Amino acid sequence: MIHYVCKYTPIELFAGFGETCAVLEEMPENFEMSDQIAHANLCGFGKSVIQAVLQGKADELVMVNCCDSMRRVYDIVASTGKCKFLYMLDLPHDDNECEKEKFAAAIRRLKEAYEKYSGKTFDKAAFFHSFAKLRTETKPYIGVLGVRVSGVLEDMIRENIRMDVDNLTCTGGRRLTVTPEELEKMDEDAMFLAYADGLLGQMPCFRMNQSSRRTALYLDPNLKGIIYH
């Protein structure tokens, strides 16, 4: 099981190695272990990632340099030696053509790193079949914004509000517009570029310089309310 912490993580890539991915959304009762090796002012989510690693709950972890906290967490986790596979993916600040090419190259470096670590060969067919189908149905929902929301909290909101909940934080709202049918027709260079385009074309997080597309959220007639976490 490969854990990840950001919606821009290319999780479909790992299906090409026969691996499954899961969001690392550990909710520890305390930070007793992480507080021993991390600064007290590190954010709660960063501490929870460190705690999970120290407890042996995430031995394969892909991180993204989306914020200063995640960069510090990566350094700390790397120093523990607890992860068999630990990788920091370089995420651009823009989604222009130049940045798409850079991100495509970053994804390919991740692929090569996992090939070297696992000894496995990348299976394109498995990669293509891993893409989730785009949701076409629309219904009223409550959007959750702000810092990361765990599945437990998401379910709690859903049960109390009695309405569908869309997690629009760092780990949720993952929707790729690229389709496997399109990718199958491309050579490898074009395929990874289109994949990078699909990842960067998601609803932008606040790391991105061009966040104007986020206004589409507030113009959605199905959005009936926002909970800011």
Which sequence ranges carry the predicted segments?
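An N-terminal assembly and electron-transfer interface module characteristic of large anaerobic redox
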Residues: M1-H229
